[in-house]
Amino acid sequence: VPLVPDATGYIAPGSNTVGIHGSWFTYSDCTDLMGKNCAMVTSPTGTGFANVGGKMCTSGTTSTATGAWGAGIGLELNDGPPQQPYDTETYKVTGFCFQLSGATIPSTTIRVAFTTQENNDNAPFEAITTPGTHTVLFSDTAQGSWVTTPTVFDPTKVMLVQFQIPSSTAAPIPWDFCIDGMTAVTE
């Protein structure tokens, strides 16, 4: 099921048959690090998420600072208002498919994560490293090896789909990539 945003990155209610509506957005560790020694998101800038035909592009560089965790882009799945959990089981959504392209795919990984109402920081994810078409199913994701108390993924309380560029203390990680042709995969 195609998920096509408008020119500001918003997917309108009723624009698809699986009830997904919300905005694309950027995020980074700058909030946690109070704007110092944090990831620099160079695009998009300002409010909204400017795009052409639903091609969501971002660029920047991560930080090597202690406490830095990276940056990324994401999509709200049920933006209310207020934002609510999205029940993937109601709409029989099992994951998402998308095209990854760009001049600089991070040399480490992009984590495609599904945050839930109870689990934002240690959300299950699948790591991807190559351009092309990718299908990431909920059943293929797992929490990171650093998670000491794993939680069970609750498909009835998904809040976001995130494309995170994790930072490294060894060297800054540059990125310049686009997500295009996003679709919800259904049973």
Can you describe what each PLM-predicted range is?
Residues 1-187:
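Beta-rich carbohydrate-recognition modules and glycan-binding surfaces
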